C-alpha cells in the first residue's frame, strides 16, 4: 500500500512511459562511467591560505591534466603559467594585462588562452555526463561555452562562426569573465568530491574563511576533528568547551577570530582579567611572525589567558564529579594544590609550582566560580549562541559532518578507534551500559547531535559528553590517556607534560589490526583502507604515511605551521580516482604571491598506494548504490503504471 502511494507520487514526476525509460537508460549509462576523483585533506588548523591553494590545484591534478594535453606544445614554464592562471584567475589576469603594451597583442593572448581552456575542459570532464558538465559551467556563458566545446572539425562550414564568437567575447570586454569562469570550472571538474578528515579549527588565524570556502564547494563531507568538536560544543552550550576555545585563541594570539570575525564581545572578560591578574611569562601569547603586538596588547592577552585558563580548570571539576564513569578524578588538580606552599602532590610525589595565578581560587572549594566569573561566562555563551556567522558555520559543520564515514569501501576517521595493547576494542561504561568500537562512536555521535539540538541545556550528559570527546581517554578524537594542560603551565618537570597515546597509534602499523577495524565497520578488509588524520607524519624521522601493508593511510595535511619543523615537510593529501590511490606530499606553502610571480607550486612527489586492476566504475561506489536503488524504483514504476 505504502509502495503504491510512493509510486503514484513518483509518477507525477515521470508522467509518461518515455520519461521513465529515458531516465532508466540515463542512470544505467552513468553506472558504467569511471568513478570520479576523491580528494582527501586533513588538519587544516585554520591555515586558509595554504588550504585554498591545495583546493585550487586539486593536489596537483590540475597541472597533471594540463601536462597531459599540452606537453608537446608548451614549455615547462608555460605549463606553470597556465596552471597559475587556473588556480588564481583574477590575480593572474591582472599581472598578464600589465605585461602588454597594446590591445592587439593582448587580444591575441586572449584568443589563444580561451582556445587552450576550451581544449582542456573536455579532457577534465571526460568522466562526466553533459548534464553534469553543464551544471559546472559559469551560468552566464553556458550557451557560448557549449557551442565552443561541441564543435567538430568534420565540416568547416562553422569555423568562421566559432572564431566570431571568441572575437565578440573579447571585443565586448567579457574575455576576463569568461577565462575566470572557465578556470573555476576546471578546478571543479578535476575533483569530484572532497573529504575533510577533521580539524578545520585550531591555532591558525582564518578558520572562518575555510568554512566559507567549504560552504561554497560543490561536493564534500567532513569527519569532525577534536578542535571542531570543541567549537560545536561551545555553540551547543558547553561553557568548558567555550573556555578551552578562548584559552587556545589567547595562547596563539588569535582572539580576533572571536571578536572581529564572530562578533563576540570580550570586554567583560578583559575587565575581569585586568582586575585579578598580572604579567605572567607562562601565559604570554605565542607570537606570529607577520603580526606585531604592542606591549599593552601582549599584557592584555596574557591576563585574559590566565583568567580563562583558571575558569576552564574550575569548570572541569563538577563534570568530573558528576560523571564518575568518565574516570577522570586524577584531573581534579586544583584540589591537590597546597596553596600556602605553592606545591602540588600527584601520584604521591610533590612538585613545586611556578607561574601560578590562583587569585580567584578558594582553597576550601577550588571549583567555585566567583560571581564575576559566572557572569562573564554567561555573557560569553549568550554572545556565542547568538552570533549569526558562527551559527551558519556550526550548522554547516553538523550538516556535512560525522565522527566517521564509510565511503566507497574505505573508513575515514580523524583520530583513532580506542583499542588496548592487545588490540581489543576498549570498552566505555555510560549510564549502565557498555560500548566499544563502532557502537561507542555511534553513541558519541548521538550525544553530540542531542547537545547541538538542545542548546539551552548546559550541564546535561550530552553536553558533558561533547567535552569528553575533546579530552576523555576513550574518545576517538583525543586518543590519549589524559590531557596535561595544567602541568604544562605550572610544573617544570617535563615528565609530567607527557600525554600517553592510545595503543592504536602503534598498533595501526599492523595489517591484522587494520583488517579487524575494517571488519568492525562492516567493510571488506581485502579492498578497504583506513584513512586517518590527526597526527603529523614525521617524515624527517623516516616515518611512512602508508602503513599496515597499505591498509592504513595517514594524511595530516601539515597545514599547521607549528608542526612543520617536526615533520620535515608540510604534509600529505590523498587522491583516489578510477585507477587507484595516490598519496601527494606537499612542501611548505609560502604565499599566493610566490605562486603568482614565480609559478612555485608546493607539490613534491606522488606515491602510488594502490592500483586498481580494472578501472573502478560508478556502479561500485556509494553513489552507484543509490543510483541502482533509483533504477529499481523506476523499473517498479514502469511495471506498475505503464506495462499493465
Swiss-Prot record:
The keyword Hydrolase applies. It is an enzyme of class 3 (hydrolase). Pathway: Carbohydrate biosynthesis; gluconeogenesis. This is Fructose-1,6-bisphosphatase class 3. Gene3D superfamilies: 3.60.21.10. It catalyses: beta-D-fructose 1,6-bisphosphate + H2O = beta-D-fructose 6-phosphate + phosphate. The keyword Manganese applies. It comes from Oceanobacillus iheyensis (strain DSM 14371 / CIP 107618 / JCM 11309 / KCTC 3954 / HTE831). Keywords: Carbohydrate metabolism, Hydrolase, Manganese. The gene is fbp. GO terms for molecular function: fructose 1,6-bisphosphate 1-phosphatase activity. It holds the Pfam family FBPase_2. Its cofactor is Mn(2+). GO terms for biological process: gluconeogenesis. InterPro entries: FBPtase_class3, Metallo-depent_PP-like. Belongs to the FBPase class 3 family. HAMAP family: FBPase_class3 (MF_01854). Its EC number is 3.1.3.11.
